[in-house]
A protein has these predicted regions:
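Structural microenvironment flanking redox-active thiols in thiol-disulfide oxidoreductases
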Residues: 48-92, 102-108
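Conserved Rossmann-like nucleotide-binding pocket used by diverse enzymes
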Residues: 9, 35, 40, 67-69, ...
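Thiol/disulfide oxidoreductase modules built on the thioredoxin-like
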Residues: 90-96, 100-142
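Short active-site neighborhood of thiol/selenol oxidoreductases, capturing the structured segment around
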Residues: 25-48, 54, 68
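N-terminal "domain-start" segment that seeds a small globular fold
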Residues: 1-28
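Tryptophan-centric aromatic hotspots in well-structured domains and transmembrane helices
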Residues: 18-23, 40, 57, 72, ...
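Proline-centered helix-kink/hinge sites
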Residues: 11, 45-46, 52-56, 63, ...
Length: 142
């Protein structure tokens, strides 16, 4: 993986509803955690195919300071409802923090255009890597 230079400070993750945790502040954890931010939608087939990798990375690297946060930015209106999102998280076995980004505020702040997209934020709060789509899992882990 070729890391980007430290030019882009990661925007804070704000949202309508948080699941599996209280709101996560990257600023409060600066110097402690590397963040993997997964932009996804539970109704997106490509996003569902990435979940085993995201969950595996969380399991393998959380003790080394990796913090995974899902940003659920729905494509369809039916995906906006908190109860529906909560049910999807339970059915998919997602236990890491997820924020509902119904108005695409976080999506736009990061300049995301495609589902799924993974963003790696270093311990200093800079965006160092961004990856779109279903491929490149092994590259991402290097």
């Amino acid at each position: 993986m070729d890391l980007q230079p430290k030019h882009i400070v990661a925007p804070q993750i704000l949202g309508d509803f948080w699941f599996n945790s209280e709101p996560v502040s990257m600023r409060d954890r600066q110097g402690t955690n590397v963040f993997l931010i997964d932009f996804w939608d539970y109704s997106c087939v490509s996003c569902l195919r990435t979940l085993p990798y995201i969950k595996d990375w969380q399991r393998k690297y959380q003790d080394f300071g990796l913090a995974v946060v899902g940003v659920h930015t729905p494509e369809y209106k039916f995906s906006h409802l908190p109860d529906v999102i909560q049910s999807a998280l339970k059915n998919l076995g997602i236990e890491y923090p997820v924020v509902s980004d119904n108005e695409a505020v976080v999506w736009n702040a990061y300049g995301i255009r495609f589902w799924p997209t993974r963003v790696l934020v270093d311990v200093d709060g800079y965006v160092r890597f961004m990856q779109h789509g279903e491929t490149g899992y092994h590259e991402f882990e290097r």
